[in-house]
Every structure is written in C-alpha cells, then in structure tokens.
Design a protein with these regions (language model features):
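Glycan-recognition and catalytic cores of secretory/periplasmic carbohydrate-active enzymes
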Residues: 19-414
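Substrate-binding cleft and catalytic face of glycoside hydrolase catalytic domains
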Residues: 112-117, 597, 630-786
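Aromatic/acidic polysaccharide-binding cleft in carbohydrate-active enzymes
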Residues: 376, 826-901, 914-919
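Acidic-aromatic substrate-binding/catalytic surfaces of carbohydrate-active enzymes
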Residues: 415-474, 478
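Beta-strand-rich recognition/accessory modules
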Residues: 476, 503, 535-593
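Acidic (Asp/Glu-rich), glycine- and aromatic
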Residues: 487-527
C-alpha cells in the first residue's frame, strides 16, 4: 500500500511539474511575441515606398536600398496572418494584408509562374531564378493569410503556386521536387538555396513544401493535395532519412543518391514536429503512428548530439567537425520539437530541455535594448554583427514557436458556465454541457425564499482572473462571494463566503437544481462531506472541506439540493465553504443531419445591423469605426436627443454627434431608424414605468401640437442639414417607459396622429409599431395592429430581444408583421439588458455563445428583416481593451465580434428558408438568394464536436467557404467541396459555423 501511495504522490508531483513548466513556456514566449518580437517588425521594417525593407541592422536601422527577398516577405505574410488568426488585432491584419498584397503584386512571376527570388528596393525583379524553396514559402504565407482573413485573392495565388510546383517542379517519375530552375523553368546547373550546386533534391526544400502543403490542405482539403502530402511524408521516412543515425539526409541528386555527410540538428528536430503535424492533417492513423515514432527518435538524437552545456542547440556537424555557431532558428525549432515529443511520450525530460533552451534564448538571443532577436551568437553567447532582418532572418521561427506553444500548451480544462448573478448553469466537458442550475438563496425553508437570478438583483459584480470566475451577490440580509475555478478536464474548485448583513430568522443556502430532462432517474447520495449525483448520462460529485448539512426537495418536477451556508442570519456572522466538483458524462459526437428546403423561401434578411446611440464621445468612435470597417452593417438606429435639441438646438455637441452618426450610416447606404429616449420636461408628466420599477414620462395630451412640431423639426433638421431623411421613427421601449411611456391605445393613437403630421410636413418617415422592451409585451401592439387606419403610417414592427424569445412568442411577432405586410425588425439585439452593470461578462465565451444562439433562432423562427445589435459602440462593446469598461491592453475584437461578423456575411437581401436538424443542441438558420445563386447556413454547436452532413444545397454549388468562431478561432476560414447538394463539415465544440457560397472580400 505504501508503494501505491508513493507512486501516486510522485505521479501527482510529476503532473504538477509538467503543468508549471508548460505554463512558464507558454506565457513567457507569448509575452516576448507580443511585447518584443511583433512590435519590432511593425515599427522597424515597414518600407513607406511599399512592402518591407530587405535589411535592418542590429540597432534597428533600415538599409533602404537593400534588395527584398521572397522568403523574407512570404514569412512576414505568414507570421502576421497567424498573429491575426490567433489574437484578432487589427494592426496584425494590416501588416498581413500589406505583406500579402505586396507579395502577390511583386514577387509572383505573371509570365512563367512561381516567384522571383529577389527584388530590388523598388520592387522590380532582381534575381529571377526560380527556387522551389521560395515558392513553398509563398504557398505557406498566402494560405495562412486566406485562413486568417478570408481573402480569396491570397488563396487563388497560393493555388497557382501549387499548380506551378506540381506541373513544373514535381518529379513524377522518381518522386520529390527539383530544387532550382531558370526563370522560365528550364533546368540549369544552378545552386540551390543551400549552396550545393550538384544537389537537385534537398531536405530543406522538401520539409518546407511539406509545411506549405499542410497549411494549404487545412484551407483547401483536396484529394490530390492529400496524395502529395503522403508522398512527401514517405520521402522523409525513406529517401531523406537515415534510420541508422536518425538524421535527415540533406542533399541528393535526381535519383536520390546522397551527397555529403552533414547532420543538421535544427532541421532534424524541426522536421520531427512538421511531420507529426502533417500526418495528423492527413488523417491516416497507421501513417500517424509511424511518423510519431520517427519524430521521437529524431528529437532524441538531435538533443543528445546537438545541445551544448547551456542547453542551446548547435548548428550542424560535418566531416570537418562540429559547427558551434549558435543561430536563432534552431533554438526555436528545438523548443517546439521538445514540446511535440513530450506530447507524444509524456516524458518530462523533453519539457525540461525546452525550458532550459528558452531560458538561454531569452537571456542571449532576445535584444532587450533595441528589440527583436539577434540572428547569430558566438560559441560563448556573444551577438555577431548580423542584420536582424535579411533574406533569411524573418519573424517566422521565433513567432511560430510562440504560436505553437500558445496552442499546444493551453491547459485543457472544463468550461464552467457562470452567470454574472452567480448561478452556474453547468460544466462543459469537451464542449458537452453537463447541465444543472445553481442558485444562492435566502429565506425560510417552506416559506418565502429569495433566489439569485437574471435581472433579480442589484449591484452584483462579476470578474474573471485567469481560470477563476468570481461573483459578488448582495441579497436581502446577506452577501455572497462565490469563486469558481476550472482546474482540469473534469474538476472545478468552488468556494463560498456568506456574510449576514442583518439579524433575520432566515437561512442562506447554495442550491443545485437538476432538470428532470436529464436527472429524472438520478440517484443522489448525501454524506457529511460528499454529495454524489448519478444519472444515466452524467455523474457529478461534490467533495467539501468540512461537514455540511444538505437536503433534497422536489420543485416543479425537478430535484433541488439545498446545502446550508448560514442556518440563521446574525448580522456580522460569516460562513465559508469550499468544494471540489468532479463531473463526467456522455459526449455526444454523433453526426448531425441537417436538411435545408430551398423551395420554400420565407422573408428577406437585409443583413445584420446595429445601434449607434452616442453615449461616450471619447470611446464610441473607436468601436464604431472598427465595426463599420470590418463587417457589413446593413441597418442602423440612432438617437434623437430630444431634450438637448429642444434646449440647445443644432449646435449642441450631442445633437451634432447624433446627426453625424445618422449621416454616416445613410451614406453607407443603410436604412436609418431615429429613436427618442428623453423628452424635454415641458413635454411630459413624470410617472412610473409600466412595471412600476422606475420613473418614466407620459406625454401631455394638451401639448400634442407643440410635441409634434418639436419632433418634426429635428427630423427636418436631419434632412436639410445632414441629408438624412429618417426611414423610421420610434419612442424607445414606450411599452415599458424608457423613457416615454404609452398605454397600448396611446401608442396606436400616436402612430396615427404623428404619422399624419409627418406626412403633412412632407416627410416620408414612417413609424415603428412597438419597438418594445422585449418580446413578452406583444399585446402592446395589438390596438394599432388591429386598426386599419394606423397601418399606412407603420413602416415596420419592432421588438427588443432582451427577454421572452421562446418559439411561440417569436412566431406571434412574425405573424403580426405578415398580417399587415410590413417587415419585422429586432430593434435591439442581445441577451442581458443589465450586463452593463458587470461588463466583464462581455468578454466571456459563454455570453458570446448565448448571444449567437439567440440570433440564429431569431433568424430561423421569426425571420426578421434585420437584427440591430445593442450596441456597435463602446456600450455593450464587441471590442475589449483600450480602456473600454476599464479594460487594459490594445483595442481588440472579442468572440462576440467574430460571431456577428460571420452572421453579417449572409448574402444581402437573402430569403430565410426552412432548416431542420436532428440534434437538439445545434441551432440552425439558412438563407438563399436564388437570383444570384448565393446562400448561407449558420450553425451553432452547443455541444461536443461532431460532423454535420447538410443536404438540400443547390445542385450547382461546387465549393463553399466555411467560417468557424469559438473561444480560440476568429472566423477562421477554409474551402470545402459540395457533392450532389450535400456537404460534410466538422463542427468544433461550442462553436458558431457559417457556410457561405460567396466569399466576401475584406472590408476596405
């Protein structure tokens, strides 16, 4: 028994050590990438005359007349494309776009294909020989640019380069790829990139064709390309590999006869992980096993023979001896290769070597004074006077190291769904939701009980710190602080601090409600320190740090577990409780069958829209500019600042900002809604909202003509001074009273009277029926809906999506719009009207998934003309950083932004069509535009990863673009082929996937 305990302890310690080492590597390399490496390249290398400088010295000085290399520019394209794909920063995209555009326009040979090896400083061809190595990097960079941005031009250029390699370079008789050619692809006795005149097939070129084809296959999974990948892997397993020494063969002739005896340690360990990656992409398990075994052997050998005493990787060994020069790139590849070998074997020594190498790199290669990395060091670690930027020295090996480690070493954790009001709605295992709903409760058992819940509480707080979510929830008589920490793939750490704020004969509990849909047959076992819940497809265990009092109750058909925190509230008394929750359950990876019926077009979808109510003139423009620049916005809603207009007129800053916003939207070409919140004091009597919660204003019936004149004067001012004739007008949420409140009949009467007034003034502006605070108050629109004399003044029906969006209610709204033949608009779109009180929630993937689920359902069920996001400003912002809600770091898009960008890719004015899915945790919406042949399908996967088979697609469709957004993918795109109207597509866990026929070019 002692041996078992000892082994268990050692195993736990080993796992902890691996986790600590991995986290150091991940965080430190990422920090260097973002704070040193990428900034150096953005600040020092951009050539104002076009593209990038060909040479930058160690001190950061550019040599302006230096030639520009193809490899350098392709690697810049790749590095910043990958950076944008990982982090979504617009500055990275700008660099990537600049690099890709320059590469396509200048480096690609328009006559013979392939790429020029070198240009002069003005971008004209200088060295026109065709090196296959350079062509491979062109494919690599451009395919990554397409993957990150969706720019079809980059993919088309990459495919042409691929075609050139296959037609002119690929040796189909003896396999492999020839090294060098003249410009017109006639063969000549030219030196390859490694300087071997008689070597026509080289290891270096083949491994980089492998990496290029691997990336290309990830965005364009073609069977011919897959065959090429298998051939390349076979070559690296046989013709270019010595199984006796576990080294690669660097140089061969046409017939694969080896030339020379050089062992290149950096290339060996780089190839080890490139082969592993390629084999995984190919998807052949037998091949993958073979490759993995070879990769580990190559890594072990390279480390054994190539590391110096400091843990740095030496360059190479030849018959003349060891080359002890220390170059930057072998260090990067050694670190990735070690991490890859550790992942394949679990051998901690690989991770230890990676950390030692990184420790050396950051103290010797990273230039703390001038930024960037040194290219080469002497044997004793002193920098050599080699340029930081040159044909070969690029932000590729070192940036790729950081990208790979960020992806590979991200901790694999459960994902606990915590609402801002403290309720836990479940724990996700590999995306599968093990659902329950927790709540905090104060009251008496069997009597009145206050429960934490959405929009039930004031002054709640939500924050995240790493993997820990913290909520502070004030309730009557008590305040609760709850922390929830995702620990590993099955474990969550919970902690509660309950503090009594008053003397009450009541108690405080943490409760878990188990829905009957999954727990009707559950067995619940309560012990002093442990609660176990076992149901057919799930198991939950709670282990507490002290004995607890717990009971179960039946509540409305569900089971509820009450765990006592404070048995009685005595002011100042506190109680703490900690628990470890472990969860397990069925992951549903079954294939989803999705069928679309294009023969039954419904209502038109103009596109996604937004609210642009200016409330923060300092921050709003940053978000507005970004949104309008980076996604298609089809509909806009702005504020009429009535009270300010009435008091200060056209020169008031708020009036100007609002009017300028309206003009900007109208110039883009979208319909504009003008909505009013605050009336001037003379126009209304103070009253309460319809729910009695706060003040509102009831318009004075005796001042109707003055009210109408004031409102119309603003609309005329917009038309005359700003060129904007408002398409629609509304009082915001007048069903509730934010801030003008109507009864249903008053709303009807206002539409008729003000509608006629506008017509008499020659304004074409129509009224919104409703613009309700949520979907539940449908009856508010009934008087006008049933009054034919009101219909001619109604331009559209509008509701806000904050509450009540069940299928039955949504269909009522859809039916109402059809009844009077006007469009339906979701005037304010999102899920939580109180979220501005706890804005950290906007950056949560849970919030993003809930929001896009709602929008997908809205599109499918009630088919609105547009959904107008609340907002596309810094309020409820889709961006984070830049001081928005006190967030730090650069301004950057959140997962929510990329979700909405994908939805906004729906073809303009496409028609909603029926779509059904056999999996309940997938929501779907589909659109078609028959005249142009365009269509789109949007899928939200709320569960584990699975394959989806979509049928009913247009028979003429050959390929589609598939975009994926989730917590780690930002509208990442690939092309897939459609066969006979059917498409098979992978749906990652907790993801929003859009399948679109027309690939939109990036916004300019």
């Amino acid at each position: 028994m002692k041996k078992i305990v000892t082994l268990t302890v050692l195993l736990v310690l080993a796992i902890a050590a691996s986790a600590d080492t991995a986290e150091i590597l991940r965080t430190e390399t990422t920090k260097n990438l973002k704070e040193n490496l990428l900034p150096f390249w953005m600040e020092k290398t951009v050539d104002p005359q076009g593209g990038f400088y060909g040479v930058v010295l160690n001190d950061g000085k550019a040599i302006e007349n230096a030639p520009k290399g193809a490899v350098l520019n392709a690697r810049i394209t790749w590095s910043f494309s990958r950076a944008y794909r990982q982090d979504g920063l617009e500055v990275y995209k700008q660099m990537a776009d600049r690099a890709a555009d320059y590469y396509i326009r200048h480096f690609i040979d328009p006559v013979y294909g392939g790429v020029f090896w070198q240009l002069d400083c003005e971008g004209h061809p200088k060295e026109t020989t065709k090196q296959t190595y350079a062509c491979a990097f062109g494919i690599y960079g451009l395919a990554e640019h397409f993957r990150a941005t969706g720019d079809r031009r980059s993919l088309e250029a990459a495919l042409k380069l691929y075609q050139t390699l296959e037609e002119k370079v690929h040796d189909k008789g003896e396999a492999g790829y020839i090294e060098s050619f003249q410009r017109d692809y006639t063969k000549a006795p030219l030196k390859g990139v490694d300087g071997q005149a008689n070597a026509s097939k080289t290891m270096n070129t083949h491994i980089h064709i492998l990496e290029a084809y691997t990336t290309l296959y990830q965005v364009w999974p073609d069977e011919g390309l897959k065959k090429n990948l298998k051939e390349l892997l076979g070559i690296l397993q046989t013709k270019l590999y010595n199984p006796r020494t576990n080294h690669l063969i660097l140089y061969c002739d046409d017939h694969w006869n080896p030339i020379g005896e050089i062992d290149s340690y950096g290339h060996d360990i780089e190839t080890s992980w490139l082969m592993t990656e390629a084999a995984a992409v190919v998807g052949d398990p037998v091949l993958k096993k073979q490759v993995d075994e070879q990769a580990v052997k190559m890594a072990r050998t390279a480390l054994k023979e190539g590391l110096n005493a400091d843990g740095a990787m030496l360059y190479e060994k030849s018959p003349e001896g060891m080359n002890r020069r220390l170059a930057w790139w072998p260090q990067c590849e050694a670190i990735i290769g070690c991490v890859n070998a550790w992942q394949l074997t679990g051998d901690q020594s690989f991770l230890d070597v990676a950390l030692k190498n990184w420790t050396y790199v950051k103290s010797h290669f990273v230039d703390q004074a001038h930024g960037g990395w040194f290219k080469d060091l002497t044997e004793d670690g002193q920098p050599l006077n080699a340029p930081k930027v040159s044909d070969w020295n690029c932000p590729y090996h070192n940036s790729r190291m950081a990208f790979e480690l960020a992806e590979r070493l991200a901790p694999a954790l459960v994902h606990t769904e915590v609402m801002a009001w403290s309720n836990i709605t479940g724990v996700r295992l590999e995306g599968e939701l093990i659902d329950f709903e927790s709540s905090l409760r104060v009251g008496t058992m069997g009597g009145e009980m206050e429960k934490s819940g959405r929009e039930k509480l004031q002054h709640i707080r939500y924050t995240r710190d790493g993997h820990t979510q913290k909520t502070i929830t004030p309730m009557h008589g008590a305040e609760f602080t709850q922390t929830v920490t995702d620990m590993d793939q099955q474990t969550v750490a919970l902690h509660w601090l309950a503090e009594a704020k008053a003397d009450l004969d009541e108690g405080a509990w943490f409760c878990m409600t188990l829905p009957s849909s999954h727990y009707a047959k559950a067995k619940i076992n309560i012990q002093k320190r442990k609660i176990t819940i076992i149901a057919p497809e799930r198991k939950i265990t709670l282990s507490f740090d002290r004995p607890v009092t717990a009971i179960t109750k039946d509540e409305e058909g569900d089971k509820a577990i009450y765990i006592t925190l404070l048995p009685t509230l005595k002011k100042g008394s506190t109680a703490e409780l900690a628990a470890t929750m472990t969860v397990d359950g069925m992951r549903h990876h079954e294939t989803a069958e999705i069928a679309i019926d294009l023969t039954k077009p419904g209502r038109v979808f103009a596109g996604f829209g937004g609210n642009f109510r200016i409330q923060n003139p300092a921050k709003d423009p940053l978000v507005i500019d970004y949104c309008l620049r980076n996604m298609r916005v089809a509909f806009g809603r702005v504020e009429m600042p009535w009270a300010v207009w009435d008091m200060q007129g056209a020169e008031a800053p708020h009036v100007k900002h609002s009017a300028e916003m309206a003009r900007r939207l109208k110039e883009i070409g979208m319909p504009v809604i003008v909505s009013c919140w605050f009336p001037p004091s003379w126009a209304g009597d103070q009253t309460t909202r319809s729910d009695g919660t706060a003040r509102a204003f009831h318009l004075k019936s005796t001042g109707q003509q003055r009210i109408f004149a004031s409102l119309a004067s603003y609309l005329e001012f917009l038309k005359k001074d700003y060129g904007v004739e408002a398409d629609y007008f509304s009082f915001n949420e007048s069903d509730l009273g934010i801030d003008v409140v109507f009864t249903p009949q008053e709303h009807c009467d206002f539409i008729k009277a003000f509608g006629q007034y506008l017509a008499d003034r020659g304004l074409k502006t129509l009224l919104l029926l409703g613009d309700n605070s949520d979907a539940t108050t449908f009856d508010f629109i009934l008087p006008a809906l049933h009054d034919p004399t009101a219909h001619k003044y109604i331009g559209a029906i509008s509701f806000h999506s904050w509450r009540g969006c069940d299928d039955v209610t949504l269909k009522k709204w859809a039916d109402a719009s059809r009844e009077i033949n006007v469009p339906l608009i979701v005037g304010e779109g999102s899920t939580d009207a109180a979220a501005h009180q706890y804005p950290s929630i906007f950056n949560e993937s849970t919030f993003a998934l809930y929001e896009i689920n709602l929008y997908t359902r809205l599109c499918a069920v009630c088919q609105p003309w547009s959904i107008l996001q609340w907002q596309l400003t810094s309020d409820y912002s889709l961006l984070w950083g830049g001081g928005i809600y006190q967030s730090t770091g650069p301004l950057r898009p959140t997962q929510r932004f990329f979700n909405l960008k994908q939805l906004a890719m729906t073809p303009e004015n496409a028609f909603a069509v029926p779509v059904v899915c056999n999996k309940e945790n997938i929501n779907a919406a589909a659109f078609t535009k028959k005249a142009s042949g365009e269509w789109a399908v949007h899928l939200v996967n709320n569960g584990a990863s699975c394959e989806a088979v979509i049928s009913g697609l247009p028979a003429g469709t050959k390929e589609v673009a598939v975009y994926v957004t989730n917590s780690h993918s930002h509208a990442e795109v690939r092309l897939l082929k459609v066969t006979d109207g059917r498409l098979s597509v992978q749906l990652p866990a907790e993801s929003f996937v859009s399948i679109i026929t027309a690939i939109l070019q990036p916004c300019k």
